[in-house]
């Protein structure tokens, strides 16, 4: 996907310094019902130049069996700023250029996020 169903960006979905935010593109978020139905593990998207990973979400709330929504837009360009206010979905945020690496072995998925200096920013192991 390109646009963010979930995002803590400070001003792309409402200027969080002056008003409320939709915390992502609501038209895109409607698709999440399909991700819930088909038990999708990860949804990756860009558009915003930063990194953010959600908690697993199902029916628009935390669920250990839900989908991780990953904003991986830090490959280049001007970096975005995050809202000064916390939200219910964000597990990890990083304002810096980065890349993802995913290894799959048998029934395990290993998910790594590194900054441009190869420092580990985020890690997740998923067993299926």
Where are these regions (language model features)?
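Catalytic metal-binding/acid-base residues of hydrolase active sites
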Residues: 4, 41, 48-51, 75-76
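A structural signal for well-ordered alpha-helical segments within the folded catalytic domains
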Residues: 29, 33, 48, 96-97, ...
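Binuclear metal-dependent phosphoesterase catalytic core
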Residues: 52, 56, 60-128
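Non-transmembrane, interaction-prone segments in cytosolic or luminal domains
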Residues: 5, 16, 24, 46, ...
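Divalent metal-coordination and catalytic microenvironments
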Residues: 2, 8, 47, 69, ...
């Amino acid at each position: 996907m390109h646009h963010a169903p979930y995002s803590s960006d400070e001003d792309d979905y409402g200027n969080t310094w002056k008003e409320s935010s939709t915390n992502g593109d609501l038209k895109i978020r409607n698709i999440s019902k399909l991700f819930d139905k088909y038990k999708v593990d990860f949804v990756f998207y860009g558009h915003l130049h930063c990194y953010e990973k959600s908690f697993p979400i199902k029916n628009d709330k935390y669920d250990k069996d839900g989908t991780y929504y990953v904003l991986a837009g830090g490959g280049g360009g001007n970096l975005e700023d995050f809202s000064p206010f916390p939200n219910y979905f964000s597990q990890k945020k990083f304002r810096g250029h980065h890349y993802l690496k995913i290894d799959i072995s048998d029934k395990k998925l290993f998910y790594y996020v590194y900054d441009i200096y190869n420092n580990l920013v985020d890690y997740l192991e998923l067993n299926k």
